[in-house]
Amino acid sequence: MSIKAKNAAHLRESAQVDSGSVQPFTRSQKIYVQGSRPDIRVPMREITLDVTPTDFGGEINAPVTVYDTSGPYTDPNVIIDVRKGLADVRSPWIDSRNDTERLPGLSSNFGQQRLSDAELTALRFAHVRNPRRAKAGANVSQMHYARQGIITAEMEYVAIRENMKLQEARAAGLLTQQHAGHSFGASIPKEITAEFVREEIARGRAIIPANINHVELEPMIIGRNFLVKINGNIGNSALGSSIEEEVAKLTWGIRWGSDTVMDLSTGKHIHETREWIIRNSPVPIGTVPIYQALEKVGGAAEDLTWELFRDTLIEQAEQGVDYFTIHAGVLLRYVPLTAKRVTGIVSRGGSIMAKWCLAHHKENFLYTHFEDICEIMKAYDVSFSLGDGLRPGSIADANDAAQFGELETLGELTKIAWKHDVQTMIEGPGHVPMQLIKENMDKQLECCDEAPFYTLGPLTTDIAPGYDHITSGIGAAMIGWFGCAMLCYVTPKEHLGLPNKDDVKTGIITYKIAAHAADLAKGHPGAQIRDNALSKARFEFRWEDQFNLGLDPDTARSYHDETLPKDSAKVAHFCSMCGPKFCSMKITQEVREYAANQRIEAVDVDVAKGLAEQAERFKQEGSQLYKKV
């Protein structure tokens, strides 16, 4: 089916939410933690646990609260209608600051053209609000407020969200132990407060991507002293995917834990696709505006102009895009440094700007007009994601002069953005072998003065097409531990094709693992609560709790049921790997019971004696390695 035919089927009167995205997780409920005002209601997911079996003490297990990116989609009390979009969360907060104005309509030329095109009526999102903009002379960025000493509702919101009811968890005994972390100089407090959030944003070490026109947003924070976040990419291309499919990818991705989503559409109807996505997104949406600008000139990079790009920025800012990837560090003098690379320039945005620079033999207009861009950003509170257009596309090219030259320029641009109180994060590689990853993180911290780092992986080897979610997940866990604030997911289809829903889920779960492993290694307060709860459930053979506490309950349950599908297996004190006779945890329980009965105090002797008895029993039963269950 052609794109045109697919989108013709996506009528605003008949669009529906993806059914798989609105199912609550088993034994989970959406809870809301209220802040200092009634309209600050911070969503979290609470997982209810079973009582410990009598054999193990019969204690009641407190519910476990986990971070929730799924928005209202998993709240059974909310009626979802993608044709109307999500409820307005932030307008009362924005109104109370009294520094914005409602425009009479779209002010970008392209936005006005699309709105007046009658042929697009069937595709267009029906409930478009008139956009907001800062009043003349005002700066509406979260960084500007933070530097004035103001704690905004958004700052309070993310502080509550980051803590995940940590005090209650400690009181319930869910954090009886947590290994000390090694944070490589990060300053992670025992509890996240709104004042700490304000300080980090004022310092430039964290950002809250929150365009004033994205009122459906549930605010989140990106910074090395907070939980490591992940981004998922969606977007159509000239080869396939409809608007409805992209909205479904959005809702599916946030169900599994995508903290932000980038719309990288390069095909037809980019403007309309983005409107549907933003109006239905509770998470920040990022874009690469140069992609759409290139479409407007028919794909000829040399025909790009500052005026066209400026109009594209305003168009997207008025829709509510929360952060822009802008490749302003690709300078004319750096392009020759890529000539001897194995893989040259692999960034789409980087290659576009390199081609423009060479065609005109002029400096990158994104660099020369950077302060003009800052004026637009602070009028809507769009955050910079300064693009790494010269990132290495192979491990052979890692950490070369082109990559690090651009990084130094991004550091210079960061200071200019901060002069305008514009929130900024820095994008990073790419393909980097493990031994060179820490150098990337250290150099970014030095060049960019601790602005949040946002990396694609990095992929640690180039030999595994089809498995690059794994090659990159390794690098992502490492750089997250070293201080990277957000990890851009990689799917199994990386380098091979556009990801489908299953690929999106696989990429997100892989990166949630990497991010959580980094949080554990950094010693983030409360990071080990979920691990401890799942380990306890595993030791007590509470199978349903094991599934439900995991990042992907569906897959865990499915794997278990492949060999032990009956309900009785959900209470069995063994799994199919070892069977009932050779389960190490069951044996440990028997050893403990024996020690208690015999009043043996020396643990080493106790374990040795117990295992010896198990060995003798094994011999008596015929020394058969495998038994029919």
Swiss-Prot record:
> One cellular component GO annotation, for this chain's record?
cytosol
- Keywords (A to Z) from UniProt: 4Fe-4S, Iron, Iron-sulfur, Lyase, Metal-binding, S-adenosyl-L-methionine, Thiamine biosynthesis, Zinc
Q: List the disulfide bonds.
A: none
Q: Which lineage ranks, top first, belong to the organism behind this chain?
A: Bacteria, Pseudomonadati, Pseudomonadota, Gammaproteobacteria, Pseudomonadales
E.C. designation(s): 4.1.99.17
Per UniProt, where does [4Fe-4S] cluster bind? 575, 578, 583
Q: Name one GO biological process term.
A: thiamine diphosphate biosynthetic process
Q: Where does Zn(2+) bind?
A: 431, 495
**Annotated region (Disordered), positions in chain:** 1-21
**Annotated pathway:** Cofactor biosynthesis; thiamine diphosphate biosynthesis
Q: Output the InterPro entries linked to this UniProt entry.
A: ThiC, ThiC-associated_dom, ThiC/Bza_core_dom, ThiC/BzaA/B
Residue positions binding substrate: 233, 262, 291, 327, 347-349, 388-391, 427, 454
Keyword Nucleus on entry = no
Q: Which cofactor does it need?
A: [4Fe-4S] cluster
Q: Which reaction does it catalyse?
A: 5-amino-1-(5-phospho-beta-D-ribosyl)imidazole + S-adenosyl-L-methionine = 4-amino-2-methyl-5-(phosphooxymethyl)pyrimidine + CO + 5'-deoxyadenosine + formate + L-methionine + 3 H(+)
Gene source species: Pseudomonas syringae pv. syringae (strain B728a)
Cofactor binding remark:
Binds 1 [4Fe-4S] cluster per subunit. The cluster is coordinated with 3 cysteines and an exchangeable S-adenosyl-L-methionine.
Function recorded in the entry: Catalyzes the synthesis of the hydroxymethylpyrimidine phosphate (HMP-P) moiety of thiamine from aminoimidazole ribotide (AIR) in a radical S-adenosyl-L-methionine (SAM)-dependent reaction.
Report the sequence similarity comment from the record: Belongs to the ThiC family.
List the protein's name.
Phosphomethylpyrimidine synthase
